[in-house]
């Protein structure tokens, strides 16, 4: 079991609970954690999401966030974690393809200021329990 304390990103300060319908019963979540080699690199990656506009690109391509957070206490520091929601794996794959092809992402990814900000990525696909509130 892992425990952590996280703080929300400035650009998304609250949990976005997905609207649920009967068709959403098969929805899935993607929980991604980006580890950095040091606090300066981690701060730049958080800036990339906030001021750099990466969250806006997510929204533009259909990567629907539930939350974005920076870990204050926990394992593998420094790191940030975010969660996305999808109807199914096909929707997830299509949204990530749109993200990688987005011209704003291509420009942001080439910005030297944001180079070498992530040293490891953990990516977990989750299915919510029937009683899940998100």
Predicted regions and their residues:
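Short S/T/G/P-rich N-terminal loop/turn motif that feeds into the first structured element of a domain
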Residues: 1-105, 114-134
């Amino acid at each position: 079991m892992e425990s952590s304390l996280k703080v929300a990103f400035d650009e998304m300060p609250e949990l976005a609970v997905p609207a649920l319908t009967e068709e959403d019963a098969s929805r899935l979540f993607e929980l991604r954690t980006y580890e950095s080699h040091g606090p300066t690199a981690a701060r730049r990656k958080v800036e990339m999401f906030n001021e750099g506009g990466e969250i806006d690109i997510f929204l533009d391509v259909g990567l629907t966030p539930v939350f974005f957070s920076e870990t204050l206490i926990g394992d593998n520091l420094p790191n940030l974690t975010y969660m996305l929601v999808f109807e199914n794996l096909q929707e997830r794959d299509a949204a990530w393809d749109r993200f990688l092809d987005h011209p704003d992402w291509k420009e942001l990814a080439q910005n030297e200021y944001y180079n070498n900000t992530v040293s490891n990525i953990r990516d977990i696909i989750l299915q919510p329990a029937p009683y899940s509130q998100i």
